[in-house]
Every structure is written in C-alpha cells, then in structure tokens.
Amino acid sequence: MPGERPTDATVIPSAKRERKAITLDLKLEVLRRFEAGEKLSQIAKALDLAISTVATIRDSKEKIKASSQIATPLRASRLTRHRSAVMESMEQLLSLWLEDQSQPNATLSAAIVQEKAEFDDLQREHGEGSQTERFHASQGWLVRFKECHCLPHFKMNSAAPSNKDMYTEMLKSIIEEGEYTPQVSLT
C-alpha cells in the first residue's frame, strides 16, 4: 500500500526529553540577564536552556521575584505543578519551623513532622474555598518535601521514639507493684 512504511526500515523512536527542574537561583539569573539587556537567544544558549523556557521565565517575572522573597533557599527547585496557596503557605511555615529545629545532633521523628504539616487551621484562615482540599502528610510527601526544600541534612526517625520509653516505664511499674528489689529483678 502506498501510505505504509516498509517493514525492513528501522524506526528510531523519538527520545522524550527528561523534565528538568529549574532552580529559583537560575530563574533569577535569567531575569538579571534580561534586565542587563541580553537577548533571549543569548541567555538560552549561555545557560543551556530552551528559548521557550527562557521566554516563560521572562513572562512570569513578578511571580518569580515574589517567590524569591520567601524564606526557602534559592537553590530549591520550584514545583512544576500548581499548588494551592494554603499548601504553599503550610510548606513555607514548615520549612521555617524545621530550620528553627536545626540544633546539632537533634533528630526529629517523621511522625512529628507529618503531624506538624497538617494544615486545618490554615484552611480555616484562608476561607471556604480551601476547605475542600484534602491533604495527607504521607511518607512520600515527606521525602519530596525534604528534596524540594533542600533539607536532606535533617535526620528523621520513622519509628516512634516512645516504644523504648514505654517498655522502661512498664518494667518500673511491674517492679514497684510486685515489691521486687533491684537484685531480684535482674536475676
């Protein structure tokens, strides 16, 4: 048939480019170069970005500059999908809280961070439109949050820290109730 490809021809599938997260720092560099008067194609070539990407960064200049005022590190990559204002606010507050908790040798349990991430009070603050959004601070969310906000240095225990303490307290109560002496309880 005239419209079909020959069967002996090898078909090379087009390679889909991997999505590249652009850091806020790089976006600010693009904007700085625009303000200095560089052309769009020159910026794209110098920073190894697509021209359409550089144009999109130029068009969303106000949003990028507003994001740079927030306390997240400049090397943090911006999320590529749209997040609600309540979710962004919660993640910013949680990031600040984690930075405050950054004492040497301090480990946080994942359960504490996930509990802190619940944003019911923020939803009430933002009104009824945000009440419909559901959020569960899952383990996967926590991993992505740490990666997005450049927080890999925080050590988080996934196990509850109370198991060891609970066993110690139970043992003490058994010893006291049975009126055992320390020598008898160790044998």
Swiss-Prot record:
It comes from Homo sapiens (Human). It holds the Pfam family HTH_Tnp_Tc5. Keywords: DNA-binding, Nucleus. The gene is CENPBD1P. Residues 78-155 form the HTH CENPB-type domain. Disulfide bonds: none annotated. Residues 40-60, 111-148 bind DNA. One of its GO terms (cellular component) is nucleus. GO terms for molecular function: DNA binding. InterPro entries: Homeodomain-like_sf, HTH_CenpB_DNA-bd_dom, HTH_Psq, WH-like_DNA-bd_sf. This is Putative CENPB DNA-binding domain-containing protein 1. SUPFAM superfamilies: Homeodomain-like (SSF46689). Its main location: nucleus. It is found in: Nucleus. The keyword Nucleus applies. Residues 13-64 form the HTH psq-type domain.
